[in-house]
């Protein structure tokens, strides 16, 4: 059976839903198969002007950087059309920004070029591209207000991973762009997995905040809970709903089939740690397990979000419990298991043939 996806589930709840995906797709299956009525096809980073060589780190200028504004125009047209047809809709926009190449409007770049750096890792090109993205998203929010549908629309903003740790990317460095968080994209440290997460919509108190950890795979159960709490998918769903947190001023818990957030990097990556590793976060504790020698690190994120002080030997029971939960989960889902020679290059999973 095909897997659960947000658009497919929404159509099961209400067949009138119209679903669309614009921007970066980056997986091999056709968007239509996963439930999208309208889409840009199997687009990847190259459709966002990405070139995988040294030029990706050089600042460039464009009036439509990374297709930000053309994606916004397409999104606004879609929203307006569905509103005229009185159709409920689900729209996902996966921006090419702020992935390299580093492209922004020249005017925006000059604004940040002339600002004094507060950290050595500050980058005017990334800052400018991020502001251009913010402007593009603002166009869509303005359209929602113009159509008077904000009281019936949930908007979710997040990212898939933290920033590259350095520009250009390299393995060794003192502080990453994500400083004071440790490391960045490609690694399961906080700089790689802790990302912005903003939700607005009916019932959510303006400017409220929450310290409850959530993760991308919580989105599907949360959306189900918002649209029709009585609906139960036929297949198991990994995450849990954070609806109560949204509607309770950031307070509450997320109930998942297993206890903790799990991240798995089953390969070596020469421009990252170059060590296969996994991590689990439960309450305020985070355990990282390295797969080459089974080394364990434990951090209290409430006291040490920078992941500088390993407290595993001071807390052997907590370390053992988290390690057992982590390994049991990977076994239960038959996850890819690192073995010597598995790196981050695209290799057919049947060739790797190494699983828990």
Specify the residue positions occupied by each region the protein language model found:
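Formylglycine-dependent sulfatase
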Residues: 1-291, 295-296, 305-331, 338-356
């Amino acid at each position: 059976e095909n897997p659960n996806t947000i658009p497919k589930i929404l159509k099961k709840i209400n067949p009138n839903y119209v679903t669309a995906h614009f921007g970066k797709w980056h997986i091999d299956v056709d968007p239509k198969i996963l439930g999208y009525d309208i889409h840009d096809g199997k687009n990847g980073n190259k459709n966002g002007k990405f070139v995988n060589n040294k030029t990706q780190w050089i600042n460039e200028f464009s009036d439509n950087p990374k297709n930000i504004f053309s994606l916004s125009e397409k999104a606004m047209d879609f929203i307006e059309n569905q509103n005229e047809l009185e159709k409920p809709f689900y729209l996902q926009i996966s921006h090419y920004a702020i992935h390299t190449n580093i492209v922004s409007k020249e005017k925006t770049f000059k604004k940040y070029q002339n600002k004094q750096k507060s950290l050595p890792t500050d980058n005017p090109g990334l800052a400018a591209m991020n502001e251009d993205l913010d402007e593009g998203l603002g166009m869509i929010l303005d359209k929602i207000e113009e159509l008077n549908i904000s009281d019936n629309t949930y908007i979710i903003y997040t990212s898939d991973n933290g920033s590259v740790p350095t520009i250009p990317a390299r393995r060794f460095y003192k502080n990453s762009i994500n400083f004071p968080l440790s490391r960045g994209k490609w690694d399961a440290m906080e700089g790689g997995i802790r990302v912005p997460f903003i939700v607005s919509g009916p019932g959510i108190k303006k400017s409220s905040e929450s310290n409850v950890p959530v993760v991308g795979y919580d989105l599907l159960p949360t959306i189900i809970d918002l649209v029709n709490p009585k609906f139960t998918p036929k297949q198991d769903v990994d995450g849990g709903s954070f609806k109560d947190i949204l509607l309770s001023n950031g307070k509450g818990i997320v109930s998942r089939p297993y206890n903790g957030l799990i991240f798995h990097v089953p390969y070596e990556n020469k421009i990252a740690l170059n060590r296969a590793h996994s991590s689990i976060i439960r309450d305020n504790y985070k355990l990282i397990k390295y797969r080459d020698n089974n080394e364990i690190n434990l951090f209290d994120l409430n006291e040490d979000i920078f992941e500088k002080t390993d407290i595993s030997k001071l807390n052997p029971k907590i370390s053992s419990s988290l390690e057992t939960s982590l390994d049991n989960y990977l076994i239960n889902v038959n996850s890819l298991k690192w073995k010597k020679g598995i790196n981050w290059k695209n290799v057919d999973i049947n060739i790797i043939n190494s699983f828990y």
